[in-house]
């Protein structure tokens, strides 16, 4: 926690400085590598952690070393993780996917924006200073065409996005030769299919079956392809966004870059304050990861925050506005039906979802069915024209462990399953959002119900938080539940920061939430038995046993904190080569003792072997040379 609280002016100035001086940066002793595919432009980034050699013998004067292989790891930081790429936030990122989109020949540029709100914003000269300078000319599907990755997959097409993902999901593990590093315990996958090698054909088949989605709006060509599905690596989402109380465009762009640096696979912009449209444009043009939104938040701003005044027309205009900016997935609370709202009356904490409470209030005030449910097919038509994936929101998720797994929660889940099938009719990709607050013993039912009710569409959960007693530490309480539900089959975990229930997260909160959730996701991958998931753990354990401190720092999810904690007690350079740490000291280090035991056992084996040879020599008469038939 920062010792001095910055003023709003200082926070904005700090964020502006971050943006102005931004450069591609690698983690300590890491380098950016690229693995190329067979299709044009498929060049997949990874981070390779360089390791120091292991001392295996020799003398002090002439030590003998054995090289350790570099460890490739998944990297979602895009150009921000490559020191060779010049970064200019004012210009945005390179349009990686634009040639692929254009080559398919099924899109057309729009001469006029479809959203009335967008037209009004562009015509307002007063916004020129806030506006992103290089506004993209949006595209949409040509008449009668669909441009979704699901549409292509169902027709047997392997897109460049699918090949990119296959290479990325394999994490470069084919480069690893060491049997020690490749060793992996069998997992318990709970029905997930985890092939030893992920191919582009496998990616296509999973997308075609609806078990995975590739969020990739044709108007967000800057994004690097990624996949969300039970049979792939567990992903992590980070939430950012301004509010009416705090945060600016500069700070949100800073949080975006910061999020990708610490491993966010997708980012949701949940802005509810001023300049939502302009903030989102800056975020999209500078984001290498898919961006999600909750359109009802902005639609509510357009009617001055009065839920009863919401209309389908205002919401539709918001969908078009955001789709043409490049939003990759929409959270839509279409499962909050009028008849389900009374089911929440006996809850301890009622309806805690912002989107859910907005729609519940609208339904009750008009005594009509949810207009998102009523117009769901029209929503799907819009999504199919831009390849916006749907994240079907859990507006009735439990907000306390007491309310977990109740009638309202599962009634909505059943409706989300119905909506999933409708979306698939339009070739629209779908994932399902889940809770929430759920005690550990009740978590698995959430996964089994989702798979059954929603036809194996990917599950995306907020935690769940396993206890309600730890404000300020809810990244821990939820990380426990996230690891469990990820193991059971959840495809993406929405991070929770230390500020959950308390306030809007800052940069450090974002980092803490992401590190916690990267741990949870990785633990789930290990438990499922995802091929190659244990390589980094094995490399860390080997470095730890061999007292290669620099390698231990660099293999960590957060090398800076690992080094800082070590140096608090052993700051000298000699501490980086010491065969102990401050926890046990030199005389009680279990690993040093283990090495001594191993060396002693090896020496004993040699001594016994020499004794056996001596006995054999004497038994043969003590002759130096044996006759040929005796040898």
Curated annotation (Swiss-Prot):
Cofactor (UniProt): [4Fe-4S] cluster
Positions annotated to bind [4Fe-4S] cluster: 581, 584, 589
Top EC category: lyase
Keyword Ubl conjugation assigned: no
Reactions listed under catalytic activity: 5-amino-1-(5-phospho-beta-D-ribosyl)imidazole + S-adenosyl-L-methionine = 4-amino-2-methyl-5-(phosphooxymethyl)pyrimidine + CO + 5'-deoxyadenosine + formate + L-methionine + 3 H(+)
Stated role: Catalyzes the synthesis of the hydroxymethylpyrimidine phosphate (HMP-P) moiety of thiamine from aminoimidazole ribotide (AIR) in a radical S-adenosyl-L-methionine (SAM)-dependent reaction.
Similarity-based family: Belongs to the ThiC family.
Record protein name field: Phosphomethylpyrimidine synthase
Organism taxonomic ancestry: Bacteria, Pseudomonadati, Pseudomonadota, Gammaproteobacteria, Enterobacterales
């Amino acid at each position: 926690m920062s010792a001095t609280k910055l003023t709003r002016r200082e926070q904005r100035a700090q964020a502006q400085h971050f943006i102005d001086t931004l450069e591609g940066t690698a983690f300590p002793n890491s380098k950016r590598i690229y693995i190329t595919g067979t299709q044009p432009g498929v060049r997949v980034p990874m981070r390779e952690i360089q390791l120091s050699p292991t001392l295996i013998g020799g003398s002090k004067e002439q030590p003998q070393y054995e090289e350790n292989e570099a460890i490739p790891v998944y990297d979602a930081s895009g150009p921000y993780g490559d020191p060779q790429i010049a970064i200019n936030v004012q210009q945005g990122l390179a349009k990686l996917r634009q040639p692929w989109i254009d080559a398919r020949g099924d899109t057309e540029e729009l001469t006029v924006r479809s959203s009335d709100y967008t037209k009004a914003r562009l015509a307002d000269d007063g916004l020129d200073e806030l506006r992103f300078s290089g506004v993209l000319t949006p595209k949409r599907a040509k008449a009668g065409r669909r441009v979704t990755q699901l549409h292509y997959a169902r027709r047997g097409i392997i897109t460049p996005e699918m090949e990119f993902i296959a290479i990325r999901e394999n994490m470069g593990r084919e480069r690893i030769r060491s049997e020690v590093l490749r060793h992996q315990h069998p997992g318990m996958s709970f029905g997930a299919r985890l092939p030893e090698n992920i191919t582009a054909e496998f990616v296509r088949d999973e997308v075609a079956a609806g078990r995975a989605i590739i969020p990739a709006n044709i108007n967000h060509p800057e994004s690097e392809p990624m996949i969300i599905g039970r049979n792939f690596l567990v992903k992590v989402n980070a939430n950012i966004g301004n509010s009416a109380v705090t945060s600016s465009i500069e700070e949100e762009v800073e949080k975006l870059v910061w999020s990708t640096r610490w491993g966010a696979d997708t980012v949701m912009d949940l802005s509810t304050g001023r300049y939502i449209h302009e903030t989102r444009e800056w975020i999209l043009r500078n984001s290498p990861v898919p961006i999600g939104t909750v359109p009802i938040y902005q639609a509510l701003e357009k009617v001055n925050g009065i839920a009863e005044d919401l209309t389908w027309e205002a919401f539709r205009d918001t969908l078009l506005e955001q789709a043409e900016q490049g939003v990759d997935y929409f959270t839509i609370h279409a499962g909050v039906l009028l008849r389900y709202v009374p089911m929440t009356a006996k809850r301890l904490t009622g309806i805690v979802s912002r989107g859910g409470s907005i729609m519940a209030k609208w339904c009750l005030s008009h005594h009509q069915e949810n207009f998102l449910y009523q117009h769901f097919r029209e929503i799907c038509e819009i999504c199919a024209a831009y390849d916006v994936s749907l994240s079907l929101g859990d507006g009735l998720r439990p907000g306390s462990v007491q309310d977990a797994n109740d009638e309202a929660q599962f009634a909505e889940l059943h409706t989300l399953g119905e909506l999933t099938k409708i979306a698939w009719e339009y070739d629209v990709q779908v994932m399902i959002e889940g809770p929430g607050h759920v005690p550990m013993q009740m978590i698995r039912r959430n996964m089994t119900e989702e798979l059954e009710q929603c036809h194996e569409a990917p599950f995306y959960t907020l935690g769940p938080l396993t206890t309600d007693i730890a404000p300020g530490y809810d990244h821990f309480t939820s990380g426990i539940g996230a690891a469990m539900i990820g193991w059971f089959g959840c495809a993406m975990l929405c991070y929770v920061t230390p500020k959950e229930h308390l306030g809007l997260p800052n940069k450090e909160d974002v980092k803490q939430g992401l590190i916690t959730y990267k741990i949870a996701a990785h633990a789930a991958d290990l438990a499922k038995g995802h091929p190659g998931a244990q390589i980094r753990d094995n490399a860390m354990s080997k470095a730890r046993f061999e007292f290669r401190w620099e390698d231990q720092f660099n293999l960590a999810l957060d090398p800076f904190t690992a080094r800082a904690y070590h140096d608090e007690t052993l700051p000298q350079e000699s501490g980086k080569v010491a065969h102990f740490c401050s926890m046990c000291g030199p005389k009680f280090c279990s690993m040093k003792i283990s090495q001594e035991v191993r060396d002693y056992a090896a020496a004993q084996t040699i001594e016994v072997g020499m004794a056996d040879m001596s006995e054999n020599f004497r038994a043969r008469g003590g002759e130096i040379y044996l006759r040929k038939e005796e040898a």
